[in-house]
Amino acid sequence: MGTKWTEEQKQAITTRGSNLLVAAAAGSGKTAVLVERIINLITDEENPVDIDRLLVVTFTNAAASEMRERIAEALIAILDQNPEDKRLANQLTLLNKATITTIHSFCLEVVRNNFFLLDLDPNFRIGDDTETLLLQLEASEELFEEMYAKEDKDKEGFLTLVESYGGTKDDQDLQDILLRLYGFVRSLPWPEKWLKDVINTFRVEDNFKFETSKWAEVILDSLKVEISGILNTMLVAVDKLKNEAGLEGYFHAFQREAYEIEQLLQYDNWNEFKNHIQAIEFERLPNAGKDANKNVKEEVSNIRKKVKDKIKEIKEKFFSDSVEEIKDEIKALYPIMEALADLILLFDKKYKEKKREKGIIDFNDIEHFALQILTEIDEEGDVNPSEVALHYREKFEEIFVDEYQDSNLIQEEILSIIARENPPNRFMVGDVKQSIYRFRQANPYIFFEKYNSYSLDTGEKNQKILLYKNFRSRIEVIEAINYIFKKIMSKNIGEVNYTEEEKLNYGAEYEIPPEDSVTGGAVELHLIEKQKVEEEVEEKEEEKNEEKDFEEEEEDLIDDIQVEARVVAERIKQLFSQNFMVYDKNIKSYRAVDYRDIVVLLRATDRWAPVFLEELTQAGIPAFADTGTGYFDTTEIKTIISLLQVIDNPMQDIPLLAVLRSPIFSFTEEELIDLRLEDMEKTIYEAIKKASQREDELGEKAKNFLDTLKKWQEKAVYMPVDEFLWYLYKDTGYYSYVAAMPQGVQRQANLRILFERAKQYEETSFKGLFNFINFINRLKVSSGDMGSAKIVGENEKVVRIMSIHKSKGLEFPVVIVAGLGKQFNTKDLYQKILYHHFLGLGPEFVDFRRRISYPSIVKEAIKYKIKLEGLSEEMRVLYVALTRAKEKLILVGSARDIKKNVRKWANAAILQEKVSEYDILNGKSYMDWIGAAVIRHKDLEPLREFAGVSLSEEEDASKWEVKLWNKKDVLLEKEKNDKVDVVERLRSLDLDAHYSEFYKEVERRLNYVYPYEKACYLPAKLSVTEVKRILNAEVVDEDTTSIFEREVLKTPIFLEKKKGLTAAEKGIAMHLVMQKLDLDKDLSLEGIKEQIKDMVDREILTEEQAKEVNIHKIEGFFKTSLGERMLSSKNVKREVPFHIKLSSREIYKDLPEEYENEFIQVQGIIDCFFEEEDGLVLIDYKTDYVQEGKVEEIKERYKVQIELYSKALENITGKKVKEKYIYLFFNGNILEY
């Protein structure tokens, strides 16, 4: 039976001849609709379309792979019914070359196919983030040096920029502004035009009227939101004064003042608004009567004072200057903004030169080059399609765009230029409420523009279709989400009105659950009081009153996170103890909840995820956190970076203590305390110098440190940073040391990555340790952490801890959204120069001669707009988080003072159905929004009662359950539960009465035989070589007892006798050279020889290893057809590690059937693979000695290994391995599988 489509889904699948915008809510089946439309086009009886005539653009490579798979599955299903349909069979063949891809990949194809239209080397490659950041830093340094050296008017403008925005000590702040602004400008379709237009806005003419400018319009909008909030505050006071005896005069005065404030909301003209607000005066209040309620009088007087202060602040901030003075301020900014624009253009030119020299392009270049190829600019400046664009218009019958709400301006320009106009052929699907990538320059206004202009009527050229039926979530989840967002989401904040059209409609079908089971249920709201835990009674009073330093604040933050994590852990355990069940579509039945059904979502994972992971693990809950971070926080990297900092400047106490405490010098805590006591006023370094005069063990350690440091400092002066870094690894023995630590292989790999970064750094004009340390610090900030992603399959039985952004597109039966009390990040609002794609540049006004600065009126406008858009994005992030839930939604957040917060939420909800934009804008966290939205709900009565709040109840179909927690109780509860009073338990036992029973139980346990004993001896992990040996052993009838053989450990180097390299060691050397060879360089005998010499110099190879490498055989490989194909590929990967999960019965064939679900992780390293247009080519090198006539035997021996490599590679890349080879270095044979 086929899928039962709704009428709206059918319309989206079958409508032709229009541009279609499908607004698809969370869980509405948009991907299924998109796939069905493609299948519908392919199988159309009257006008069938070949799959390679469609362009399908997805947001990620994973989404593209999934789309391709879904289309393939659908085609195969149809073919099963129509096996004779040759055209349909051909579509499966065409599917491999169909353009189902990300926009970046499509643009890259355009550039590679048309590079000759650009001044571009056809052998270009895409630089990684580190490489391009280094080039940008190098270009900016060189540019600044050139600007300082100039002797013309450009230098004057540049020096004004440095004085205004460079920072207090150097010009670093200006360099940061340049790089940040350059990145933004390059995200726009026509960056130079944008810059020119923006600078011209500061060139104000005599007829310029600020009061009608776009900046004035934005500021007036912001002030109206502010005034509406002030008015509501006044109306609360008016309401409190009603019928208050003795305060009638107050009531009339407050009413009059509220009316005057309300009048401001009607003015859309700057001057009218200014005149009215300037005229507002707060006259002296009349005397209160003798019978007046003093509490009410004091409360309303405080409200009035706050209102007066707010009105005064608005007057002084925006209306103290005349429009002429504002005009002069903007005019004064023109020359400095012009100098900034010129600097950006000069930087762009220099950065392009650097990239050209390296033969690389960056990710922004891909889209810009594609746009350049696809467009032609005529004399009037109009943009027209080029011949290439017209070719694509002809080629693509329809253009599909998934996740359309996340498109940016340049992507929209590209897709528009290749789309047909008659008949229109665009199909765009997305949900603007899930647009959460503005930080990547995604622009939801692109979606809004079409949403507001497209028609719901069929047959229109531009048509929209609404899919708002949710097939994912239970009714309890949907009603709670609707209840929250109808209160807080609006056109101004959230950027969409949450109307009846936008709300989620229940469409899922959940069967009736079994009796005595727990399913679904009310949405839970867990509020945690973040009060400070009281000290133990025996602690001294003065210790309680000490001021908190940074470390204590950090500990408090960790405590707060721990408390939330423990609350979450407790709730997860309750789900299992209460027989909570979920509906499993695969088995079409209910089953007990599993750990894999649960996800914990966090807005930010950097600090939170590790704490949650630890707490859940300690609670006995298997958990996994895929943060994509952690590289710079690993022990080995922190230690080495600290060491480099100390070598550069030993006067830094924190890095120095880290190095002294590390295994490199192994100072004990007692010794470090002794050092500190040497001289409390001096630095640690000075204390070490003083301690080195001592005649004890500490003195010896201190002297050794100083001697070693001096030696390293001398070497650092003349050695390149990469060589010096490798020298440190070897000299300290730290590289070998970390190998013996847990995850030693990973730790060594981390150190090698740092070495590679140093190598990249040395290829630039930067030199020296100081600059390298600065570069690493910049890398942390600019490119984020470099943690390697960990892969967990969807069926792994663990609770996932992930960011809300990573959860987008996923769904889970149980969703726990934690950290809801965490404050929003608003740091972007406090940059010296703000920027906005519509409003332009917003600089600080700086008078560096008088040493004063303040936000310009332009900056105030942009600041408000950025805040508005940032909070709109946060609202959509919250929407994404809540809509991941299928059956159970649990919300967790902390607040410093819950009663105070509840009163704040009640004030926000007291006067109107919807929470005001003022209260939304002034909300500090998700919890402020949720609290204000739900506080009037009937189920929130216990919370209102707790806070002493009286508020009219609101009826709603949603169901809520509130639980209050206290930080102190949560922290102490765990400590209490960890202690077991064994004595009391023993006392309670009647040993005589139960002796025989205990005896029997002891005997039963001693004689117990575990039924799955063999599983205990199965290895958790095997190498590919071990798997090959086990499977090949079947021919000699080996059984699984071989898994119990003793592991033969490698003899340590210091115990080995020197006797030359073994065959295995020679093979390792050969593989190392094949891994490290630069394939872009000369690969003749001389070229290979020179590269090997360089590897020895950099201590990648030893002299002994280098002598054993047969360069003739390496050259021979590259002369083969296989080697030539590898060199011509644009994507070659070498030494790729992998893990793959296999059933134990696939490896140990004699295991019984009950071991089918016992899995073993198989690990290995793929020597090499490269990509061609139609798939991947896998190569494994072998250095074995091969007897004459034994080639086929070799091929058979490694068959299992090659198949495992192929399977792993397809899993990793999502691409088909089309060819598999072994290359035998011994005789140059190529064995194909």
Swiss-Prot record:
Catalytic reaction equation(s): Couples ATP hydrolysis with the unwinding of duplex DNA by translocating in the 3'-5' direction; ATP + H2O = ADP + phosphate + H(+)
GO cellular component: cytosol; DNA helicase complex
Gene3D superfamilies in alphabetical order: 3.90.320.10, P-loop containing nucleotide triphosphate hydrolases
Annotated UvrD-like helicase ATP-binding domain residues: 3-474
Positions of the UniProt region annotated as Disordered: 533-555
Gene Ontology molecular function, alphabetical: 3'-5' DNA helicase activity; 3'-5' exonuclease activity; ATP binding; ATP hydrolysis activity; double-stranded DNA binding
Assembly description: Heterodimer of AddA and AddB/RexB.
Binding site for ATP: 24-31
EC number(s) given by UniProt: 3.1.-.-, 5.6.2.4
Protein role: The heterodimer acts as both an ATP-dependent DNA helicase and an ATP-dependent, dual-direction single-stranded exonuclease. Recognizes the chi site generating a DNA molecule suitable for the initiation of homologous recombination. The AddA nuclease domain is required for chi fragment generation; this subunit has the helicase and 3' -> 5' nuclease activities.
UniProt record similarity statement: Belongs to the helicase family. AddA subfamily.
Protein name in UniProt: ATP-dependent helicase/nuclease subunit A
HAMAP family reported in the protein's UniProt record: AddA (MF_01451)
Alphabetized UniProt keyword annotations: ATP-binding, DNA damage, DNA repair, DNA-binding, Exonuclease, Helicase, Hydrolase, Isomerase, Nuclease, Nucleotide-binding
One Gene Ontology term from the biological process aspect of the record: double-strand break repair via homologous recombination
Top-rank lineage group of the source organism: Bacteria
Domain UvrD-like helicase C-terminal: 518-809
Cofactor(s) listed in the protein's UniProt record: Mg(2+)
Source species of the chain: Thermoanaerobacter sp. (strain X514)
